């Protein structure tokens, strides 16, 4: 049997797929790492995996960033044992909202910085998680007292992730 008759994808497609898979593995690793961290407050983690979504958006485009965010939540949740639990639902809602917000900001706000994109993603992530928790799990008015500090922490986290994304992107562009 001649193996030359099998179709081969172009090299640039293989490189793109390999880059996406490397980013996915990094995002999953950060998802698992963050799950082991003690929270900085109720429902708050630093959002390091969203940094990888932002890098995927910058380096590969919106479809790859969105699919990376989805794959990261599903596979990461499988590995930490939260797949199809309330934690998974909250994580999926927040991760998808962050990815969509970052894509929208990147596309429709001319001249926005990576920090700005990351800030909007972090705020969308937190607000969506908060709305998900409030609508599906905890219907208590007192829950709203937690929102201002959570949004403040999200802004800090979004700023740090945006700055890190800028640094990493500059290093990658320098080496490419």
Predicted regions and their residues:
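Membrane-embedded alpha-helical hairpins and interfacial helices in multi-pass inner-membrane proteins
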Residues: 85-89, 104, 108-176
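Generic alpha-helical transmembrane segments of integral inner-membrane proteins
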Residues: 21, 25, 29, 55, ...
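Hydrophobic transmembrane alpha-helices
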Residues: 2-56
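Short helix-perturbing small/polar motifs within transmembrane alpha-helices
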Residues: 2-12, 18-26, 68, 90-124, ...
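Generic transmembrane alpha-helix motif of multi-pass integral membrane proteins
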Residues: 48-64, 101-105
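Interfacial aromatic-anchored transmembrane helix boundaries in multi-pass membrane proteins
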Residues: 30-46, 71-100, 137, 142, ...
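Transmembrane-helix signature of polytopic, membrane-embedded enzymes
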Residues: 63-71
């Amino acid at each position: 049997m001649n193996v030359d008759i099998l179709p081969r994808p172009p090299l640039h497609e293989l490189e793109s797929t390999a880059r996406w898979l490397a980013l996915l593995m990094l995002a999953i690793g950060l998802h698992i790492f963050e799950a082991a961290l003690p929270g900085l407050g109720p429902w708050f983690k630093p959002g390091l995996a969203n940094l990888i979504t932002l890098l995927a958006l910058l380096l590969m485009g919106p479809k790859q960033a969105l699919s990376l965010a989805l794959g990261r939540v599903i596979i990461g949740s499988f590995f930490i044992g939260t797949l199809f639990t309330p934690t998974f639902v909250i994580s999926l809602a927040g991760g998808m909202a962050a990815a969509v917000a970052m894509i929208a900001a990147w596309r429709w706000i001319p001249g926005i910085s990576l920090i700005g994109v990351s800030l909007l993603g972090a705020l969308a992530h937190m607000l969506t998680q908060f709305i998900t928790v409030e609508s599906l799990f905890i219907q208590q008015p007192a829950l709203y007292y937690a929102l201002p500090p959570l949004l403040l922490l999200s802004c800090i986290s979004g700023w740090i992730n945006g700055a890190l994304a800028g640094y990493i992107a500059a290093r990658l562009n320098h080496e490419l």
